[in-house]
């Protein structure tokens, strides 16, 4: 497909996100690793391109600022979970937020393979407060639709450990990873519940929950129908 992954789009810090008009669409896929997010994003991208829309796929990558700070013995001692979260949020604004805003200005459809929910869930899993983490990322471009791939911790743990070498599949490692996955899942569920109550997630974006254990083709249809409502005028139905 012509849609490409942007992993390091150049930042433009001179322009503020808040002052930019929105013309494109931002659709994000969230959920645990191995839940089918990438397949959903790729499928929607191909479907949109067949309808003449310009599509760009972005992937939420680990923060380069935090990685460099963690590798430097001089800064490592000061790299608390809160400091790391602040660095990661600033990095995300420059690497992801500003370039996404520019693409929305150009009437492109931006599909994000993980976005703010993932960042928030990771910070909460490291022991930070949910509201604090939500506020940290609320200035990112607001998604027009969040596709939440809802699964269970047990299946996610099995998928993850199955891809690891035998040396890291010990009971202790599995238990520690399981606790992390459970914290991530609890945060995803809390954000989904906030959306259901209209409480912000940190945005007032519609959320479509996709059951990862359901038929993939059925999930793909649900996702396409939700996206179709955003890109096609009311009543202008086209074949799937």
Regions found by a protein language model. Give the residues of each.
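ATP-dependent small-molecule kinase phosphotransfer cores
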Residues: 53-135
């Amino acid at each position: 497909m012509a849609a490409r992954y942007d992993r390091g789009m150049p930042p433009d810090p001179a322009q503020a996100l808040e002052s930019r008009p929105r013309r494109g669409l931002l659709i994000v896929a969230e959920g645990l690793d191995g839940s089918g997010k990438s397949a959903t994003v790729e499928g929607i991208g191909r479907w949109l391109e067949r309808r003449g829309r310009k599509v760009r796929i972005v992937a939420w990558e680990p923060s380069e600022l935090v990685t460099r700070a963690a590798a430097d013995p001089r800064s490592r001692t000061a790299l608390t979970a809160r400091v790391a979260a602040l660095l990661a949020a600033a990095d995300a604004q420059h690497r992801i937020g500003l370039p996404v805003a520019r693409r929305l200005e150009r009437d492109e459809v931006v599909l994000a393979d993980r976005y703010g929910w993932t960042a928030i869930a990771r910070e909460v899993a490291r022991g930070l407060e949910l509201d604090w983490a939500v506020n940290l990322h609320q200035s990112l471009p607001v998604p027009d639709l969040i596709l939440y791939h809802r699964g269970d911790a047990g299946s996610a743990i099995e998928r993850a450990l199955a891809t690891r070498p035998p040396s890291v599949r010990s009971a202790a490692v599995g238990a520690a990873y399981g606790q992390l996955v459970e914290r991530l899942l609890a945060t995803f569920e809390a954000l989904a519940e906030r959306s259901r109550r209209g409480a912000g997630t940190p945005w007032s974006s519609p959320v479509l929950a996709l059951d990862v254990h359901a038929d993939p083709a059925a999930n793909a249809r649900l996702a396409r129908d939700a996206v179709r409502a955003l890109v096609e005028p009311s009543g202008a139905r086209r074949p799937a």
